[in-house]
């Protein structure tokens, strides 16, 4: 019996020690769970408005919401909390003096979904600054002094839905955040209002789905006035997008150092916006989106004949794929107005799209290339021919023989009726006209033995000309045509 009593006493002693340790641990936990200058309520810790220069240490690991706003925090280092806060989903750091955040500052809070860094003194968002926050859904960075946003600052944040960057000094539109929807696929709100944006990537903005444009806020920026900008926001106004409808008076642009409302650009002679129809040609493959203002809506398409378009393509070549209208090969009878009825949990929307079909096919790329090539070759050949005509003289034909001197009789008929050569020998002396350069055209004069009209006088004979030099003029044939009216010189 004695051993049993000793064993029972030992068990009682161990139980007492265990209970004592449990109470001590619970008391210690109650001390750690609520740091000084903080208000604790279950898993919520509020340390706001305490003028804290540093984050309180020994934060309980079960903390789900930590409020450190309205304090004097200036730096958020990598070791700001020695405890890994895996249960923390909301961290409030607004209205502090933060000007530095370590790239490893968010390693202890991997499951954070809500982060408020607004109203601080941040200047730069470095690359991979938030890459450890892969579960983050809402990020508030408004009312800082941000000038530079690195292109990789928001890497690996596939769950981010709302990003607030308003009231900063950003001058470059971070197009990488929205282009193609790959970096932030769930982003539905991007607030860039009240910054220093002057130019927008209009082409990329036009391609965005309506549910992204609906939450893209760009008001209160000194945008450069342009008709393309007017067309962009007019389209958003036509679609009744919240980003435009809620801030119409604050959407302005800058021209000649003056602000103008974007929707009053009459002095630019901008064309009035009209919703354009889709255009297609015979045989084209076409996809028309049901561009709703919300994601995840159920979509139903109705054809111009008021029939529902099914995914199996019961209406000819038309079918529905992933909520979009798909035409395998466009036909003439496919033209008309299609209506998309979109239904969501809290919002319904109706969209109408007009399709115009042209009754011909477009030339292929190969034909277009051939036409352009032919035109180019024709132009080059034309230029070459013109250059040859202008600058290259005809070649002398060396195959022709040397011409023999013609006889006097042959020359009589081919002699010129008008001659610029004086009818005297320039080598003879004693002539009054020697040295006098008079340009006179003569008809062939009559010979000394000729009578009127070049006829021979009776008893006279025709003198034979002597061999002379080049300057000696040959006598004309008395029966030649050139002897007619031969006595009168013509002065030129």
UniProtKB/Swiss-Prot annotation:
It is found in: Cell membrane; Perikaryon; Cell projection, Dendrite. Residues 404-492 are annotated as: Disordered. InterPro entries: AMIGO (IPR031283), Cys-rich_flank_reg_C (IPR000483), Ig-like_dom (IPR007110), Ig-like_dom_sf (IPR036179), Ig-like_fold (IPR013783), Ig_I-set (IPR013098), Ig_sub (IPR003599), Ig_sub2 (IPR003598). One of its GO terms (biological process) is myelination. SUPFAM superfamilies: Immunoglobulin (SSF48726), L domain-like (SSF52058). The modification Phosphoserine is found at residues 476, 480. Expressed in hippocampal and cortical neurons (at protein level). High levels in cerebellum, cerebrum, and retina. Low levels in liver, kidney, small intestine, spleen, lung and heart. PANTHER family: AMPHOTERIN-INDUCED PROTEIN (PTHR24368), AMPHOTERIN-INDUCED PROTEIN 1 (PTHR24368:SF1). Homodimer, and heterodimer with AMIGO2 and AMIGO3. Interacts with KCNB1. This is Amphoterin-induced protein 1. It comes from Mus musculus (Mouse).
């Amino acid at each position: 019996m004695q051993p049993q009593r000793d064993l029972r006493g030992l068990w009682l002693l161990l139980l007492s020690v265990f209970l004592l340790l449990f109470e001590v641990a619970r008391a210690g936990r109650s001390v750690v769970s609520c740091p000084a200058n903080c208000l604790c309520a279950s898993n919520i810790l509020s340390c706001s408005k305490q003028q804290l220069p540093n984050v309180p240490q020994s934060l309980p690991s079960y903390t789900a919401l930590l409020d450190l706003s309205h304090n004097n925090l200036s730096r958020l280092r990598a070791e700001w909390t020695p405890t890994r806060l895996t249960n923390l989903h909301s961290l409030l750091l607004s209205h502090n003096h933060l000007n530095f955040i370590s790239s490893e500052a968010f390693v202890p809070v991997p499951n954070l979904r809500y982060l408020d860094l607004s109203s601080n003194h941040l200047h730069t968002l470095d690359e991979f600054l938030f890459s450890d926050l892969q579960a983050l859904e809402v990020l508030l960075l408004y009312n800082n002094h941000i000038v530079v946003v690195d292109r990789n600052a928001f890497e690996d944040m596939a769950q981010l839905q709302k990003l607030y960057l308003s009231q900063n000094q950003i001058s470059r539109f971070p197009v990488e955040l929205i282009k193609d929807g790959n970096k932030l696929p769930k982003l539905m709100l991007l607030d860039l209002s009240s910054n220093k944006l002057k130019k927008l990537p209009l082409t990329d903005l036009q391609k965005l789905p309506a549910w992204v444009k609906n939450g893209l806020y760009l008001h209160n920026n000194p945008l450069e006035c342009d008709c393309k900008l007017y067309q962009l926001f007019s389209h958003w106004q036509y679609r009744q997008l919240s980003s435009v409808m809620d801030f119409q008076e604050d959407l302005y642009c800058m021209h000649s150092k003056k602000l103008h409302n974007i929707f009053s650009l009459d002095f630019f002679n901008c064309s009035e916006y009209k919703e354009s129809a889709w255009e297609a040609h015979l045989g084209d493959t076409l996809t028309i989106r049901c561009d709703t203002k919300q994601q995840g809506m159920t979509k139903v398409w109705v054809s111009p004949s008021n029939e529902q378009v099914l995914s199996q393509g019961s209406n000819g070549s038309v079918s529905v794929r992933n909520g979009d209208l798909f035409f395998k090969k466009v036909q003439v009878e496919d033209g008309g107005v299609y209506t998309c009825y979109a239904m969501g949990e809290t919002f319904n929307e109706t969209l109408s799209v007009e399709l115009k079909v042209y009754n011909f096919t477009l030339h292929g790329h190969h034909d277009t290339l051939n036409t352009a090539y032919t035109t180019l070759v024709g132009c080059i050949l034309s230029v070459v021919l013109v250059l040859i005509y202008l600058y290259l003289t005809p070649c002398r034909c060396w195959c022709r023989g040397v011409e023999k001197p013609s006889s006097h009789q042959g020359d009589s008929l081919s002699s010129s009726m008008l001659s610029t050569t004086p009818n005297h020998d320039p080598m003879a002396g004693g002539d009054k006209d020697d040295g006098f350069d008079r340009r006179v055209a003569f008809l062939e004069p009559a010979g000394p033995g000729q009578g009127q009209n070049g006829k021979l006088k009776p008893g006279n004979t025709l003198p034979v000309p002597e061999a002379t030099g080049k300057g000696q003029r040959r006598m004309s044939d008395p029966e030649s045509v050139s002897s007619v009216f031969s006595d009168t010189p013509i002065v030129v």
